[in-house]
């Protein structure tokens, strides 16, 4: 009897927490009616992602209502068709845990059939009080410098009160933030010890930034939450892309990526490399001993066995290297406080993570998400044996 009671208690705890998890999914619901506001049953409703080939279809019920569950964060177009009525379209933006409600009024078809396109204005997510900013792949590509591997312009250029100082991203005055991939956390408790990027911006499809008033299940990093929807391959048809650049300070940010999809399966993978002679923020106007470089790989796989199940796998492995900038003038005011002119130190940061998600839809109001993950992180501060004064090495390794 005690074992049964304990089992029921554990099961209750598990199921009570189903709704308390970070996610990248929302749902879209709506109603279709004629000019007299009578519901139209059996109308075909198609949901299409604007930035990829991902789509779902359904039909309205006897009440003229339709529902799409487990819709990833992003921008979508909904098309409603029914014989004897004009085709109608609307666009909508889905945020995590949101549930926008759409209304379609179908006009009686004329002899020359037309398509009515309704452009929906951007509105606040009424399902949440959390201030949210959504940045998509096109925004990153069109923002100067935002697609560089070490750049945070995709955040600082779009999010109020976001800025970078002493090489750390700050939001609302603090740098304790959380990163999530597909709604799965990539934890790192070594606050301010890591400088390398969590993901190359070129691998991002959508980035949802939350900056306060979020649910407790997101953790205790109270200054900001960055929820990444990586590129899936639904935007590709077995195609590859090579991105190269070259700029000041012998800077280059290069990537080779490829992806493709079928009706139920999509894949995306990339390799990237970057370097620059201007890495970290220098203590003075002169840039000395400040090179950086990095390389890595990223992969994303999505499989939909049936309409009620989805499997998502994301993996990343990269290494970054930074020289620690110095002030070369031994007589400067800064060197009188702490002499750095004799230092030749560096920071090396290997990092890798794997996240897996199984999303099962029981009904429109109950979705189960199982998301195991593993994250390896290391920050190695490496001092030169010729340092003056002597600096010790610091090795910090974490497994999550």
Task: Annotate each predicted stretch with a short phrase.
Residues 127, 253, 267, 276-282, ...:
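Outer-membrane beta-barrel proteins
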Residues 246-275, 285-322, 346-367:
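Transmembrane beta-barrel wall of Gram-negative outer-membrane proteins
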Residues 83, 120, 212, 229, ...:
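Outer-membrane beta-barrel pore domains and translocons
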Residues 17-130:
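Periplasm-facing N-terminal accessory domains of Gram-negative outer-membrane beta-barrel systems
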Residues 136-139, 189-190, 209-210, 238-241, ...:
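Extracytoplasmic loops and strand-loop junctions of Gram-negative outer membrane beta-barrel proteins
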Residues 66, 169, 256, 297-299, ...:
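Membrane-embedded beta-strands of outer-membrane beta-barrel proteins
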Residues 85-86, 90-107, 111-215, 225, ...:
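Periplasmic N-terminal accessory/gating domains of Gram-negative outer-membrane beta-barrel systems
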